[in-house]
Amino acid sequence: MSSKGSSTDGRTDLANGSLSSSPEEMSGAEEGRETSSGIEVEASDLSLSLTGDDGGPNRTSTESRGTDTESSGEDKDSDSMEDTGHYSINDENRVHDRSEEEEEEEEEEEEEQPRRRVQRKRANRDQDSSDDERALEDWVSSETSALPRPRWQALPALRERELGSSARFVYEACGARVFVQRFRLQHGLEGHTGCVNTLHFNQRGTWLASGSDDLKVVVWDWVRRQPVLDFESGHKSNVFQAKFLPNSGDSTLAMRARDGQVRVAELSATQCCKNTKRVAQHKGASHKLALEPDSPCTFLSAGEDAVVFTIDLRQDRPASKLVVTKEKEKKVGLYTIYVNPANTHQFAVGGRDQFVRIYDQRKIDENENNGVLKKFCPHHLVNGESKANITCLVYSHDGTELLASYNDEDIYLFNSSHSDGAQYVKRYKGHRNNATVKGVNFYGPKSEFVVSGSDCGHIFLWEKSSCQIIQFMEGDKGGVVNCLEPHPHLPVLATSGLDHDVKIWAPTAEASTELTGLKDVIKKNKRERDEDSLHRTDLFDSHMLWFLMHHLRQRRHHRRWREPGVGATDADSDESPSSSDTSDEEEGPDRVQCMPS
């Protein structure tokens, strides 16, 4: 009894906040509480055996009772055995249920994980797409923002002309934004059966020469919409350029083509072509020639063989090699060449790399910097992996500026007087230059505007000073506008592309043209350019295209020689200092990447 009471008292004192383990220290009042404490202990033991609750103070009292006497320990042990059985059954059920629940949760988690990953990817993709769309919107808005106030206004200019204080009304009007914004298609000139690759006005602006894939050259009276004459060029492949030589009385046309030949046509006063003769031969396609502004006898020619010829029609052997364009020891095929109108000793070339190269004919030393006077390139393209090509470049009217159009890139304006390696000064965006050798040009008597075609079939005109798009016209149903030729004196523009006609544009609209759909076209061009930069497949396409063209040229060549009486006429009039007619078959597959049609 004392042992039991002792243990009970220990529990009771613990409940009261004090701990006493000596029975001699208990008072009479404490002995009176012993009976009630024992009842509470038995009740708590009974509750413990029924509920299986072993936590809290009950667990502490049970442990203390087990250390006092064996008799009480046996009673407790019998209760504990019952409790142990009760616990083990519940625990097994709980463990079993818990394991099944965990397995189900794991299975659900495994099924849910791919779904969550897909949702996360979709959310990230949507977020990236929305970010890209927002960035594209911001970019388009910056390219189509409000224009500054025009410098030339029609009513004040007319009033000044009436008062006799403006002697240059037409000159200034041709360079006015208000006229460019009123451009509208006047008519088409139809006479070719292939893509039209080249256009050129004579000095007076009365005639317009055009060359085509049909191997013909047509000289137009563009006002009356009638051909003055048309003739076979003598070329064996796509005619890329045909230009009137200045101060020649419109009697001499210089031509070049994919076959690499440089030919000259002599026109008679009776509106016929007397003959054409070959004066030079490139080992590859020849896209452009460069006229000297006042010379009726001399011009320059550049080809994909990296060679620049100077041609003087007064010489027995007209062509002489001027320079071979190289980057370090590697040849750089050329697509374009232009003579500085203010300093005809200097000329610029561009081609199958990212550099605009300027040469001075008096100082070409190929042992020193490969003969280059200076080079320009947008700094972000110098060491880039974009493989940018220059498809066209032109000098401004006074030679102070140089405009270059890059394949699958933008158009850049350089100051030609800047030092070697200088950065561009202006950049013109929005068009697409990928499918062909795209032309670019200045428009206006003072080169106030920049004009370019695009793969989307539109013509873009930018104000040079602000870089803003001020005119946007659908120029080709076939999808690509290649050639843009401003009239030398009037506010007129001639364009051509994959369509088989020449289009004449003039400022005859009653109001400024609404730039309807411009933002959508710019977005589409930007997306296509970005996609092509990520997924370039043009290498395979170029190899296939080169193979097919090479095969067709061979078949056509053999067919001509099998026909009776064919084969000697061209050779009789050829005067070439260079390689044979078959050099066009030496073009590599990468030379076809920028073909004009």
Curated annotation (Swiss-Prot):
Transmembrane regions listed in the UniProt entry: none
Biased composition (Basic and acidic residues): 65-99, 124-137
Region annotation (Disordered) ranges: 1-147, 558-597
UniProt motif (Nuclear localization signal) ranges: 114-122
Superkingdom assignment: Eukaryota
Keywords: Cytoplasm, Methylation, Nucleus, Phosphoprotein, Repeat, Ubl conjugation pathway, WD repeat
Major subcellular location class: nucleus
Position of sequence motif Nuclear export signal: 39-50
Any single Pfam family the record assigns to this protein: WD40
Extent of Polar residues compositional bias: 1-24
InterPro entries linked to this entry: DCAF8, WD40/YVTN_repeat-like_dom_sf, WD40_repeat_dom_sf, WD40_rpt
Residue ranges of WD repeats: 191-230, 234-275, 281-321, 329-369, 385-424, 432-472, 476-515
Pathway(s) this gene product operates in, as recorded in its UniProt entry: Protein modification; protein ubiquitination
Family of the protein in this entry: Belongs to the WD repeat DCAF8 family.
Free-text function comment from the UniProt entry: May function as a substrate receptor for CUL4-DDB1 E3 ubiquitin-protein ligase complex.
Protein name according to UniProt: DDB1- and CUL4-associated factor 8
Organism for this UniProt entry: Pongo abelii
